[in-house]
Swiss-Prot record:
Membrane topology note: Multi-pass membrane protein
Protein origin, superkingdom: Eukaryota
Keywords: Glycoprotein, Membrane, Signal, Sporulation, Transmembrane, Transmembrane helix
Post-translational modification note: N-glycosylated.
Signal sequence coordinates: 1-19
Cytoplasmic compartment residues: 192-193
Protein name as annotated: Outer spore wall protein 4
Organism encoding this protein: Saccharomyces cerevisiae (strain ATCC 204508 / S288c)
Keyword Ligase: no
Traits of the deletion mutant: Displays elevated rates of loss of heterozygosity (LOH). A combined deletion of the LOH1/OSW4 and IRC18/OSW6 has reduced dityrosine incorporation in the outer spore wall.
Residue ranges that the UniProt entry lists as topological domain Extracellular: 20-170, 215-219
Glycosylation site positions: 42, 62, 136
Localization, UniProt: Membrane
Family: Belongs to the OSW4/6 family.
Amino acid sequence: MRFQLFIYFYFTIVVIAGTNTIQQFSDAGDRLITSLRNLDNNGTYETLTAEKVPIIEGQIQNISAKYEQHTFILKGLEAVLNYKVKSLDNNERESLEIEYEKVEKALDAALNVSPFEYIKKFKEVSRGKVVNALENLSREQNRITINGGREDEKEKEAREKKKRLDRIKRILTVSLLELGLAQGVADLCAVAPFACLLGVTVGSIGFIFWLALIYNAIQ
């Protein structure tokens, strides 16, 4: 009887948690749309807004429906949307046309690029290879040299890599508490300190790289 009650309460909690996650993601979508609308204070882009907002609303609804059984995905995407809202509200933005285009493109990627393929791909790689890859990334991030104020092609490439790594680092920071993926941190901290922000199971690395794809598209 106690076991049955435990099962009942467990599934009740799971259902409630899932419902709350869907609502929180939808709320983040609403805040994003409001922030986009607020960029057009004088109504110059009224036609553009009337065209784009229904598309974005539909994308958010479709994402909620597609991932309603995978709350960790919705929580990650919620973090991305919240970060975008914050950047828009802080005037870290481009033209309204470009911002609508970036949001639409990012949400389209969330719908059509499977996070499960990323997770599967990383699960097929041994933990040793993943840790080694992260170690190499960390080394690349720190290996930037400037000679006489002049950069050669390799140095420019290194800077571009650093920019990409910094973006990944930012999404890790944003997502840590909300994703609840803090597992197996210790073995990674020794080789890639920035990755300590996320406890890394091999599958969760794949998910984070998928999430970084969405993050890069929307920023």
